[in-house]
Amino acid sequence: MASGMGPLKRLAAWFSDLRLAIVLLLLIALASAVGTGIPQGDPPSSYIDAYSDTPWLGLLHGEQVLQLQLDHVYSSGWFLALLAWLGLALILCSWRRQWPALMAARRWIDYRTTRQLSKLAIAESQPCPDTSQGLTQLETVLRASGWQVQRKPQRLAARRGAIGRVGPLLVHTGLVLLMLGAAWGALAGNRLERFLAPGRSLDLLDRDGTSQLTITLDRFAIDRDPAGRTEQFRSALKLQGPNQSLDAEISVNHPLRHRGITVYQADWSLATISLQIGRSPVLELPLQTYPELGDQIWGLVLPTRPDGTEPVFLSLESEQGPATVFDADGQQLARLRPGGPSAEVKGLPMRVDAVLPASGLLLKRDPGVPLVYLGFAVLLVGGGLSLVATRQLWAIAADGTLSVGGLCNRNLAAFATELPQLLQQVVVDQQG
């Protein structure tokens, strides 16, 4: 059994090495940067189309992006393996280093000789006519300064800031909780993106096919500056579930959280255009995007003759218009404002009555979010406690001399300056 523990201890030491943890953190940060640079969760065909002619960073084609699981970095097997590896490294580091350090800080160490004190990081001696009284005065000064003191005949031990040793343990615990929450959310979470036009609904079903929640878009508005640039867009939603109903408004950076589901205002689009051609009634026709013409170009193709000949292309960039009409040769025929007058197109009067925008909603269900928040809270508390310096001090009174030694895990120079001043204060008080 003893011979078998050697390799296990070496393996545990390697896993808990700080350098390994730093490398893993860098790899996770790099993977997160890749996940930010490459759109996540899109259909596979979109990666093939996007990176077939222009590889990502000049290196990866669409097929390679899919093979390396870069289309879903945060739920990929290799990313979760990195999180598990780092979590194991932090747990082993806490077990092998931080926990023993905390136990050592809580344990009183009894130094009995001045020679032992002289070997400490800080050691000072001061002549003291009455060493017993000097030791008592030192104890009084230390207790007044918030030190814990253990007094024994002709010697004492004191400590302050032992709670700082809890900080690294809490930091490691917070990181592990954070990674567990992230992994749980990646494996058990759901994400859905949909465009809804006002009056339309979206049903969220449970595993049995029963409606869990119905989201209806009552109104959608886009706020623009005087130049027509988008400033904000907001959606008035109605949520209906079993025995409950809720009205709420969401906007960019102001999501709605309800029963474990978060609804974000993510995007906007143009859904339909209401047209009147000649003497026809007002027709509500769907619009579609044309990415080959630009990032935000919507339009539709309309025939102008009963047999479908002489088509025209109508395009828009916003719900405010104008709608620009082109013929098959790309020549501009007319510009129509929503709600404005009609214009003649191919011998027919054409009028745009209205353009209906659609709200882009992002729905996320992430069961790991509470664990992530808890991890961040524990991490912040641990980080704050880690800043607390842990100081230990020993004093021995012998042969007319008061000898003091100390250890400190942080800001040793300040402690080295403070110790002689502490001794001098004891001597002055004794002389007084």
From Swiss-Prot:
Keywords: Cytochrome c-type biogenesis, Membrane, Thylakoid, Transmembrane, Transmembrane helix. Pfam families: ResB. It is found in: Cellular thylakoid membrane. The keyword Hydrolase does not apply. The chain crosses the membrane at residues 18-38, 76-96, 166-186. It is a multi-pass membrane protein. One of its GO terms (cellular component) is plasma membrane-derived thylakoid membrane. The keyword Protease does not apply. It comes from the Bacteria. GO terms for biological process: cytochrome complex assembly. Belongs to the Ccs1/CcsB family. Required during biogenesis of c-type cytochromes (cytochrome c6 and cytochrome f) at the step of heme attachment. May interact with CcsA. This is Cytochrome c biogenesis protein CcsB. It comes from Synechococcus sp. (strain CC9605).
